[in-house]
């Protein structure tokens, strides 16, 4: 009996399944991305059912990009924390044209030769949840939340249910890997439908579409995510080689060609004046859109310029979010409290009658500092106008002085710290008033909480409530006191049993093994974040070496500028801090590290500066190769620079190198030099 007499062959079935997948993917793309249906719903449903039946009969035919795999898997038990291949930076915010111009002036100081009409790309900022998508050879392999920017939660199963996210890229020649960033959101229509359904079932209503989208993505059951019908706009693409060199507008066009939805109202603006006009136009029109937008993202068009400007620890220097004016509401100021932070900064906080703003109820707002108090001329009992800056953070905008009670008393910052009673100081050229008493309970509490945080010493179980008890009972007056605590003493604390006490003692003991870079970050030196701490610890491999470094030596470290260098140098001159270092060393903390061991010393003593875009290497890759050969990479050109490695469209660093007669290398010459160093 022949195969034709018994039914279709396995090959024919596989071909039909492949054909169905392609037809359904094309129809889904046309419907959800282009909004141009090419197939009636009934036809789509019939083809979908045919593919579903084939896959049920032949499970080996199921592929990760099959439309049937969007429906949702079985509920998960939790989300795994995953490392982003490329960090998800947040954006600096601007709330008016003046702040936008200030940003523009800042980046131009770093790239002074860029013409006035450098070019900007304006994109509407979607009010949703930031998402990172990872593709390998064209297939979606992972999706994650932003998290802290470095690590997020892996929610691939949930993201597969969003029909505007392609499971397979629309290209015959996909790169080995591709990272796509974008915003998952709920349309206003779907948001209203969901709240209507929840109200019928007696469930709590979502406060706003952003909260609904973020909460939906963290559902353990993908079937719930599928039911809520999230949408997605892509706004960033990163990949190897040519994929990494697209200018901003071209990168958005590329995303669209790969099958992604991209917010359609983007615009290239040659000048900042046109950016401001775009923002003004959309501020008036934004409520006509079918989804929420809370501002305009302004990015430099040139990818070369983006690469040259790079990032701060938190933001890209080449982009900013220009936020719309928020909704405002009047309320009555009841009183002002003063908080003391871990650096001793006094922050006045307005306490006012609860008021609804942007979907949430607020009753407190920071007043920042004494200057802001003076500008507002606040009096207790005033009627104040409150808004949400960026529709997230409450702030006091102005005072309605015509409504001020006759007996209202002005608000002023105290001359003594509300926590310890010691006189406060306001250093010259600073807006912040500070308590400088290192034993102030508020400063000690803040220092302990920071020391125990995940990126510092990572002491599990040492939370804010326990820290409050330890400080209020006088058991801990400085970080080093933690290492004298024992289990019986801890077990005597409120709501703290023997088991918890034993666990905390073990966690504190374990923290003695944390590396020098974490200890340095845990010290809480102003301006020294975890990245800067790693860079400093790699260069100065002990607390003693760091303490003896001059400001110039500190500023020469990659990523460290004069402000950070001065803060570090000043910290080590304070006697209290010197005593703390000695006590930590006695307690067994790691105040010594090991310098990164280069594979060779062939480039020892030579300093390199990187500028422009290299053909195949990223800056971090080039830096790692140089350091592995014993060389040093600096962020600025000086007479001590040995070589400047210049890529395409190198900027002012190359010009300075030429003026100083410093040798220049291209990528090929750098690789040749490194090859010689290897042997």
From Swiss-Prot:
Enzyme Commission identifier(s): 6.5.1.2
CDD domains: BRCT_DNA_ligase_like, LIGANc
Any GO BP: DNA replication
Family annotation (Pfam families): BRCT, DNA_ligase_aden, DNA_ligase_OB, DNA_ligase_ZBD, HHH_2, HHH_5, Nlig-Ia
Record field: catalytic activity: NAD(+) + (deoxyribonucleotide)n-3'-hydroxyl + 5'-phospho-(deoxyribonucleotide)m = (deoxyribonucleotide)n+m + AMP + beta-nicotinamide D-nucleotide
GO molecular function, one term: DNA binding
Entry GO CC: cytosol
Cofactor: Mg(2+); Mn(2+)
Enzyme class, spelled out: ligase
Binding site for Zn(2+): 417, 420, 435, 440
List of catalytic residues: 125
Domain spans labelled BRCT: 598-679
Binding site for NAD(+): 41-45, 90-91, 123, 146, 183, 299, 323
InterPro entries, sorted: BRCT_dom (IPR001357), BRCT_dom_sf (IPR036420), DisA/LigA_HHH (IPR041663), DNA_ligase (IPR001679), DNA_ligase_AS (IPR018239), DNA_ligase_CS (IPR033136), DNAligase_adenylation (IPR013839), DNAligase_N (IPR013840)
Keyword field: DNA damage, DNA repair, DNA replication, Ligase, Magnesium, Manganese, Metal-binding, NAD, Zinc
Family: Belongs to the NAD-dependent DNA ligase family. LigA subfamily.
Matches recorded under PANTHER family: CHROMOSOME TRANSMISSION FIDELITY FACTOR 18, DNA LIGASE
Function: DNA ligase that catalyzes the formation of phosphodiester linkages between 5'-phosphoryl and 3'-hydroxyl groups in double-stranded DNA using NAD as a coenzyme and as the energy source for the reaction. It is essential for DNA replication and repair of damaged DNA.
Protein name, as recorded: DNA ligase
Organism, as annotated: Synechococcus elongatus (strain ATCC 33912 / PCC 7942 / FACHB-805)
Gene that this polypeptide is encoded by: ligA
């Amino acid at each position: 009996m022949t195969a034709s007499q018994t039914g279709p062959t396995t090959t024919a079935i596989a071909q039909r399944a492949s054909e169905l997948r392609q037809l359904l993917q094309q129809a889904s793309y046309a419907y959800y991305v282009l909004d141009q249906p090419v197939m009636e719903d009934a036809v789509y449903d019939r083809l979908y059912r045919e593919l579903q039946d084939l896959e049920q009969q032949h499970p080996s035919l199921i592929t990760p990009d099959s439309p049937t795999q969007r429906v949702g898997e079985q509920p998960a038990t939790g989300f795994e924390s995953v490392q982003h291949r490329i960090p998800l930076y947040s954006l600096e915010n601007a709330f008016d044209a003046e702040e936008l111009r200030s940003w523009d002036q800042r980046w131009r100081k770093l790239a002074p030769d860029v013409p006035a009409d450098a070019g900007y790309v304006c994109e509407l900022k979607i009010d949703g949840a930031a998402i990172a998508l990872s593709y390998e050879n064209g297939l979606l392999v992972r999706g994650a939340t932003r998290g802290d920017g470095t690590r997020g939660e892996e929610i691939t199963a949930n993201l597969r249910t969003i029909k505007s996210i392609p499971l397979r890229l629309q290209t015959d020649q996909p790169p080995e890997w591709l990272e796509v960033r974008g915003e998952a959101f709920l349309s206003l229509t779907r948001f209203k439908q969901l709240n209507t359904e929840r109200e019928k079932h007696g469930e709590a209503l979502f406060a706003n579409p952003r909260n609904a989208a973020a909460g939906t993505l963290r559902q353990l059951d993908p079937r719930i995510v599928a039911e809520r019908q999230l949408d997605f706009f892509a706004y960033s693409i990163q990949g190897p080689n040519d994929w990494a060199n697209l200018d901003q507008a071209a990168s958005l066009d590329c995303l669209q060609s790969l099958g992604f939805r991209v917010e359609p109202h983007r615009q290239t603006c040659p000048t900042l004046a046109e950016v401001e006009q775009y923002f003004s136009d959309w501020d008036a029109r934004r409520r006509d859109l079918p989804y929420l937008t809370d501002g305009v993202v302004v990015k430099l068009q040139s990818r070369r310029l983006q690469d040259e400007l790079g990032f701060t620890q938190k933001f890209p220097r080449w982009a900013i979010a220009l936020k719309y004016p928020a909704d405002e509401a009047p309320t009555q100021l009841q009183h002002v409290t003063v908080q003391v932070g871990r650096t001793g900064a006094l922050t006045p906080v307005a306490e006012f009658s609860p008021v609804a703003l942007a979907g949430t109820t607020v009753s407190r707002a920071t007043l920042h500092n004494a200057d802001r108090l003076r500008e507002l001329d606040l009096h207790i009992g005033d009627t104040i106008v409150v808004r949400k800056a960026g529709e997230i953070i409450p702030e006091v905008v102005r005072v309605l002085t015509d409504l001020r009670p006759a007996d209202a008393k002005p608000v002023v910052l105290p001359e003594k710290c509300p926590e310890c009673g010691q006189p406060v100081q306001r250093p010259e050229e600073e807006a912040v008033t500070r308590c400088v008493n290192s034993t102030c309970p508020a400063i000690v509490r803040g220092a302990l909480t920071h020391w125990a945080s995940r990126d510092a010493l990572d002491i599990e179980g040492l939370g804010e409530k326990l820290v409050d008890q330890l400080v209020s009972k006088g058991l801990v007056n400085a970080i080093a006191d933690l290492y004298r605590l024992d289990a019986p003493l801890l077990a005597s604390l409120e709501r703290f049993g023997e088991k918890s006490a034993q666990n905390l003692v073990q966690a504190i003991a374990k923290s003695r093994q944390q590396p020098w870079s974490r200890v340095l970050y845990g010290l809480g030196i102003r301006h020294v974040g975890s990245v800067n701490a790693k860079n400093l610890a790699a260069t100065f491999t002990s607390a003693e070496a760091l303490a003896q470094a001059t400001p110039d030596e500190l500023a020469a470290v990659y990523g460290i500028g004069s402000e950070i260098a001065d803060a570090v140098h000043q910290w080590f001159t304070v006697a209290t801090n010197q005593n703390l270092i000695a006590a930590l060393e006695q307690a067994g903390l790691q105040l010594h590290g090991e310098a990164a061991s280069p594979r060779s010393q062939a480039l020892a003593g030579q300093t390199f500066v990187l500028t422009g875009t290299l053909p195949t290497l990223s800056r971090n890759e080039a830096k790692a190769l140089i350091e592995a050969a014993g060389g040093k990479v600096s962020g600025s050109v000086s007479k001590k620079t040995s070589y400047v490695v210049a890529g395409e469209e190198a900027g002012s660093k190359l010009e300075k190198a030429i003026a100083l007669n410093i040798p220049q290398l291209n990528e090929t010459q750098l690789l040749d030099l490194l090859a010689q160093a290897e042997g």
